[in-house]
Structures are given as structure tokens and as C-alpha cells.
Curated annotation (Swiss-Prot):
Pathway: Secondary metabolite biosynthesis; terpenoid biosynthesis. Involved in monoterpene (C10) olefins biosynthesis, constituants of cannabinoids and terpenoids-rich resins. Catalyzes mainly the conversion of (2E)-geranyl diphosphate to (E)-beta-ocimene, and also produces minor products such as (Z)-beta-ocimene. Mg(2+) 1 binds at residues 340, 344. Binds 3 Mg(2+) or Mn(2+) ions per subunit. This is (E)-beta-ocimene synthase TPS6FN. The keyword Magnesium applies. InterPro entries: Isoprenoid_synthase_dom_sf, Terpene_cyclase-like_1_C, Terpene_cyclase_plant_C1, Terpene_synth_N, Terpene_synth_N_sf, Terpene_synthase-like, Terpene_synthase_metal-bd, Terpenoid_cyclase/PrenylTrfase. SUPFAM superfamilies: Terpenoid cyclases/Protein prenyltransferases, Terpenoid synthases. It comes from Cannabis sativa (Hemp). GO terms for biological process: diterpenoid biosynthetic process. A motif (DDXXD motif) lies at residues 340-344.
Length: 594
């Protein structure tokens, strides 16, 4: 399925919307002088803080885990684990090992073996000896890897599930948790999985209450590890966590598990640290690029969030072999962020019209029509994308049409402009209008279309690029890009809505729905969460319809929305929590021995 972005050209005649009470007079104003006329222009200011991650600090990063003796040790551990995985006779134990490898972030080292095992599981899927835990685990792993497993496989467990409902205890909890995690692979119209999620969520919450009460009464229990993973799952299910972010948490949790395998733990820690050392080199590269542009130095009204932009990248593609991918897409993230701030907080409507026109023309001569402060961002955008096209043609040896890439920037700038028009006119769009514009303005189409062409040197088959993206010539995008973008748009809104209103941005989905339906903020937030679940169902349907690289990028991008915005605006904010996230994933290695 394909989707065309709707760009509203006359915001005064849109039906169904209302005027908001937003006023720029309520927000910080910054005065600027326009050289051509010496006129003073009142500009908004978001008062973004400078980046806390200095160039010198990034260039000084070092890691002891590069090279020997750690790489030799990892190769030995990898051989040993591979032997265990392949030679396992117990089918359930094999599934559990695959799940553990995934959560530890090292399954990519055993990709061929895991695919072979799961293919055999799929062929012999109806195992009469499996209980709820085994069937739910197998179902989740198979769906995760793109197998079309029917939800009806759970019908054989009706009696077992009913018994659990009547009398839940600690022995059942791993089965309930497995079913809970599996239920998030629900597609449209899958009522069995929908009911399973409701039932298991209630059971898991009751279980946490029961354990909490036992601890208050000082009753001994053996569920420390179980309760930790249950609480973690209730906070956010596995299907909404990226491999790298989950690995950082799970390595610590797995170390506390009574029956943990020391060999797996050592491999996971070493792998995490070795991969992290490649991230340091990626960071040094993109920080040198950013310093060379001097955008952050000369135009300090916009966010300088290169480290935060890089964080998105390791959620999408963390493995060492994707260094090329990360260094390219990190630049895209920063350019999207920077240009967003030009539209959101600094440019006048007339200036934004000029910038949008310049992007449409994609011609360096257009800088002569732009105000001084827009010339550098425009040239950096133009030159960076053109250089990327050249480098892909040179390094990747695949065909790339720059018109596809240009189209994404034009659409995004038009959507930014639309939001600016809504703001300056005091117009609050309907939720539908907001969504049709917002899934473009969130920047996901720009990132995902460009990113597709950065995979060819990673043994990823990049074929049928024209078949996949020629729809852009007609104004449409692949459905999986839209669904990923909608999830990202809503997770962003849930975290940043209040802050964006304070600095005078256009209304978010929450305010649009509140005003359209005359409901409270709490009700609006619940509705947005419902729409996120609906978009996930659609994206689950998309699996298998597109190349695996595009599917994985889009899915991981949506997952990173939860990670970045789970506790606030992790993209813009530089509070202690955001700093800790970055430090633990990118800067600090995991101690091998504790």
C-alpha cells in the first residue's frame, strides 16, 4: 500500500478546523536585523542550550576493547556458543537460547544458524508437547522473523489459559509473560491476540502486586529475576524495544539470574564493548563533519544535538559493520533537526516560503534569494546530500536517483511550512489534518528513504530500488514508512507537547484532538496511545511486503521513538536522565567482572 502526503496550500479554507488561542506574544522574542532593509524582525527563541558534548571530548574517546586479545576471545566464545546452539536436542531449550541471544544483543553473530532453526520450527509448528510458554515463545520468535504464523495456534491452549485465569501463581508467570510479549505482534483484526494482551496485562499487574505484598510481609520468595523481567515488560514490551537498548538492560538482569550461562554473559559483555569502540570512531567522524560546517557555531538559535542524533542511529543499526550507515544517517538526523528549528522558532513566514522554494529548485543559485542566515544551512543541505549520492554511487555500486532523495526534503519542508502557517494564523487543525501533515514533518520519510541506499556494502541485497521508490515520483510513500512515521510522531507528541506549546510551536496531536472533540488532556493522550497501537498493527502487517533492510530500519526507527521519548524529550533535553542514557550506551563500557 502507498500513501501520498497531503500538503495544505490554503490554511484559511480548511474545513473542520478551529482557531487556537496561541499567541506569539506569550513566548520569548528575539530581535534580529535584516541586512537588506535594516528592519528589525521579532523572532521567537526556544532558548536551546549548547551541546554538553564537546568536540575535544569526543575526539579523546578511547577503548581498550579494540583489537587483540578481545577479538580472539570473542571468536572462541562464538564458536563454542554456535556449537551448543546447533547441537541442542531439546527443542524448547533451543528456542530459549535464541531468545536469550537476541536479548543479549549477540544474535546477529548466529544469524544463519538461527534462521535455519526457525525455518525447521515453522515447518513442524504444531508440537503437541508444547505448553503455553513454549507455544507463545515460538510464536513470537517466528513472527519476529517474518513467518506467517496464524493466531489460531493458541486455540489449543484454551483450557490451560482458563485454568490460569482462575488461579494464577508463580509457576505460571513465565507462560503468561511469553503470551503477553507475543500479543504485541497482533495484526489488524486478530481478536485472539487482542484478548490475550488484555488478559495477560491484567495477570502480570496482579502478579507484581502479589509479590510486592509478599515482600512487605517479609515472606521469602524466589521470584526476584521473574519480577524484574515482568516489570520491565509492563513498562514496555520487547516488540517496542530495540536490540541495543534492550541488551544494555538485559546483560545486567541476566547476570543476576540463577541459571545464567557465564559463557553467554562474557560474550555479550565483550561484544557490547567491542561494538561500542566502533561507535566512538563513528562519532569522531561526524563531529569533525559538523565542526567543518560551522552551523552550530554560527547559527546558535537551533539545536546542536549531534550526540542525540547519533543515539537514534545505534538504535536503528548498532552492529560494527553498519558504520557507513551510521555516519551517513547521523548527518541526516542533525540536518532535519536544524532545519526544523528554522521553521519552528526562527524564520518568518516569508523567509520560510523562500527556503521551501529553494529546496524545491535544488539549485545553489537559489542562495542569492535567501536571507543571510539561511544561506549556510541551505548550502550544507545541498552539498551533503549531493555528496552522499556521489559516495553511494562510488562505494555501493548501486543505482540511486537523487530525485527520490530531493522529494523527501521537499515534502518535509512543505510540511514544516504548513505547521508555520497554522501557527501564524492561529489555526488548530483537525486530528486528521494534523496526522496527514505530521507523519511527514517528523522526518522519518527523509531518514528511511536515504538509509535504504546505505546498506549495499553490508551483504544486504539492495534490489528493485526503482520498484520500491518510483512511487515517490507520483507523490506516494511505501506504507511501512508512513506507519513508522506515525508512531514516531505520536511518541514525540506525548513527550514534547507541553514544551512545544511553551515555546510557541503549532499544536500537537494532543491539542488538536482536545479541541476537536472537546475532551480532557488525559482523554486525548489515551486516544493517541490507542492510535499508536493501531499503527503498530498495520506495521506488523507490513512485514514481508518490503525488503528486510527497509522493514528493519522502519521498525527500529519506531521503536527508538519509545526509547527517546519514554521519559520526556530525550532528543532536545540534556537533563541527567538523557545524559545517562547516552553515557551508558555510547560512552561507558560494561565491566567484565563485577
Amino acid at each position: 500500500m502507498l500513501y501520498r502526503p497531503k500538503i495544505y496550500t490554503n490554511y484559511n479554507i480548511i474545513n473542520g478546523g478551529t482557531k487556537s488561542r496561541l499567541s506569539s506574544a506569550c513566548y520569548p522574542i528575539q530581535c534580529a536585523v535584516v541586512n537588506s532593509s535594516n528592519a528589525i524582525i521579532d523572532r521567537r527563541s526556544a532558548n536551546f542550550e549548547p551541546s554538553i558534548w564537546s568536540f575535544d571530548y569526543i575526539q579523546s574517546l578511547t577503548s581498550q576493547y579494540k583489537g587483540e586479545p578481545y577479538t580472539s576471545r570473542v571468536k572462541k566464545l562464538e564458536r563454542d556458543v554456535k556449537k551448543i546452539l546447533v547441537e541442542m536436542e531439546n527443542s524448547l531449550a533451543q528456542l530459549e537460547l535464541i531468545d536469550t541471544l537476541q536479548r543479549l544483543g549477540i544474535s546477529y553473530r548466529f544469524e544463519n544458524e538461527i534462521n535455519s532453526i526457525l525455518n525447521k520450527k515453522y515447518v513442524n509448528i504444531n508440537n503437541p508437547n508444547y505448553n503455553l510458554y513454549a507455544i507463545a515463545l515460538e510464536f513470537r520468535l517466528l513472527r519476529q522473523h517474518g513467518y506467517a504464523v496464524p493466531q489460531e495456534i493458541f486455540n489449543q491452549l484454551k483450557n490451560e489459559i482458563e485454568n490460569i485465569k482462575k488461579n494464577i501463581n508463580g509457576n505460571d508467570i513465565m507462560g503468561i509473560l511469553a503470551l503477553y510479549e507475543a500479543s504485541f505482534y497482533e495484526k489488524k483484526c486478530e481478536s485472539i491476540l487482542k484478548e490475550a494482551r488484555i488478559f495477560t496485562t491484567e495477570c502480570l499487574k496482579n502478579y507484581t502486586i502479589m509479590i510486592s505484598e509478599q515482600k512487605k510481609l517479609m515472606i521469602d520468595n524466589d521470584y526476584d529475576y521473574d519480577i524484574e523481567v515482568v516489570n520491565h515488560a509492563l513498562e514496555l514490551p520487547l516488540h517496542r524495544r530495540t536490540t541495543r537498548t534492550e541488551a544494555k538492560w538485559f546483560i545486567d538482569a541476566y547476570a543476576k539470574k540463577q541459571d545464567m550461562n557465564p559463557m553467554l554473559l562474557e560474550l555479550a559483555k565483550l561484544d557490547f564493548n567491542i561494538v561500542q569502540s566502533t561507535h566512538h570512531e563513528d562519532l569522531k567522524h561526524i563531529f569533525r563533519w559538523w565542526r567543518h560546517t560551522k552551523l552550530g557555531e554560527k547559527l546558535n538559535f537551533a539545536r546542536d544535538r549531534l550526540m542525540e542524533c547519533f543515539l537514534w542511529n545505534i538504535g536503528i543499526r548498532f552492529e560494527s559493520k553498519f558504520s557507513y550507515f551510521r555516519t551517513k544517517t547521523a548527518k541526516l538526523f542533525e540536518l532535519v533537526t536544524f532545519i526544523d528549528d528554522i521553521y519552528d522558532v526562527y524564520g518568518t513566514l516569508d523567509e520560510l516560503e523562500l527556503f521551501t522554494k529553494a529546496v524545491e529548485r535544488w539549485d545553489v543559485k537559489m542562495i542569492n534569494e535567501l536571507p543571510e542566515y539561511m544561506k549556510m544551512p541551505y548550502l550544507v543541505l545541498h552539498n551533503t546530500i549531493n555528496d552522499m549520492v556521489f559516495e553511494v554511487l562510488r562505494d555501493q555500486e548501486i543505482s540511486i536517483n537523487i530525485q527520490y532523495l530531493k522529494k523527501t526534503w521537499v515534502d518535509m519542508c512543505k510540511s514544516f511550512l504548513q505547521e508555520a502557517k497554522w501557527y501564524y494564523s492561529g489555526y488548530t487543525p483537525t486530528l486528521e489534518e494534523y496526522i496527514e501533515n505530521g507523519w511527514i514533518s517528523v522526518g522519518a520519510p527523509v531518514i528511511l528513504v536515504h538509509a535504504y541506499f546505505f546498506h549495499a556494502n553490508n551483504n544486504r541485497t539492495i534490489t528493485n530500488t526503482k520498484e520500491i521508490f518510483e512511487c515517490l515520483e507520483y507523490g506516494y510513500y511505501p506504507a511501512i514508512i508512513r506507519h513508522s512515521a506515525i508512531i514516531l510522531r505520536f511518541t514525540n507528541d506525548l513527550a514534547t507537547s507541553s514544551e512545544e506549546l511553551k515555546r510557541g510551536d503549532a499544536p500537537t496531536s494532543i491539542q488538536c484532538y482536545m479541541q476537536e472533540k472537546i475532551v480532557s488532556e488525559e482523554e486525548a493522550r489515551e486516544h493517541i496511545k490507542f492510535l499508536i497501537n493501531e499503527a503498530w498493527k498495520e506495521m506488523n502487517n507490513d512485514v514481508g511486503l518490503y525488503p528486510i533492510s527497509l522493514t528493519e530500519d522502519a521498525t527500529n526507527f519506531a521503536k527508538m521513538g519509545f526509547f527517546i521519548y519514554q521519559h520526556g524529550d530525550g532528543h532536545s533535553s540534556q537533563d541527567n536522565q538523557s545524559k545517562q542514557k547516552i553515557s551508558s550506551l555510547i560512552i561507558e563500557p560494561i565491566p567484565l567482572y563485577t
